[in-house]
């Protein structure tokens, strides 16, 4: 086991979790569109929102109540939101992390009047003493400078999964673009470049821990012993507030000079041919974009100014000691087409990420007889079928190790 420690991240997946997730995925694709699950009522205005918007919920619900809008907000990760909408769950508006995901919705979903509500860079946050050691303080840092620090085993970082979260995907696409030399348009041919793949693989050798959600990443970082994290600027601001309240060293934010991934937090209407809902959406969107609504977003560490710059930004939020300079223009990464995004994420899943060792413990006890056993079989057929699993970027790579342990009262086959 020690010999394989550097090559494998060992994950134990308990089968009831597998069933809950994968059977739900299967059920979604088979049944949801037919039965109209979660169809919105005539009165309730339903928003499906990325989890990072929870900190603005109280303000938005207060406005809705004062303006006779019966508002319901459901939260999920951005990529999960796309799955929910594509699988037929009905909402009146979507408030996701990044506009790139709206282009991945099915053609039958009519999304209108999408407007960016804030700007949130996805950046490196490094312990200030470590950033000083690396020579990153008060210096223009490029992605290859970070890569070199990782190559020399001087830097380890944590981040969310590129295939399951917006922050992970956005950061990854930023790495791809900058290491490819920032082409005017990133193409599928660019993704096949062996040197690019080599550098991306080297960069991800520095990933000490990965998380399936941004919320867990923040919690994991605060409770662990990590020297760097890749996440939203807003998240690092929140992490630093907590670190300083505990008397701990804050993180120093690095904005790569050659390009930073930006999340634009679009708020968009899902047209269900309901004039009353369209009017309610318009009022909610106008409030979010009003001076009052934007001021509430700024309090949480979001940038709402043109180009993300404002020399008069609140220094208690955008603290210069943390490497934040709101007077400087952030160079945004150019996102590629939807097809190239899908291709690049597939390459990460099958070629670039660290190999994993997944252990499936399959329950064949009497309580699983009948429907339970059928669900178990369907779940395993789904996750082990590369073509099916790849639809949700859950496929294994040839480097992964899979162990299956069937059991009832005892482990079977021993």
For the regions a language model picked out, list residue spans one by one.
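Acidic, polar low-complexity linker/tail segments
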Residues: 7, 30-32, 306-359, 366-374
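N-terminal segment of the mature folded domain
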Residues: 36-164
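Ligand-binding cleft/hinge of the Venus flytrap
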Residues: 61-65, 143-216
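Periplasmic-binding protein-like
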Residues: 116-124, 150, 163, 197-203, 245-273, 278, 287-308
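Extended ligand-binding regions for polar small-molecule ligands
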Residues: 128-140, 264-299
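Ligand-binding pocket segment of bilobal, Venus flytrap-like solute-binding proteins
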Residues: 183-255
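Von Willebrand factor
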Residues: 353-414
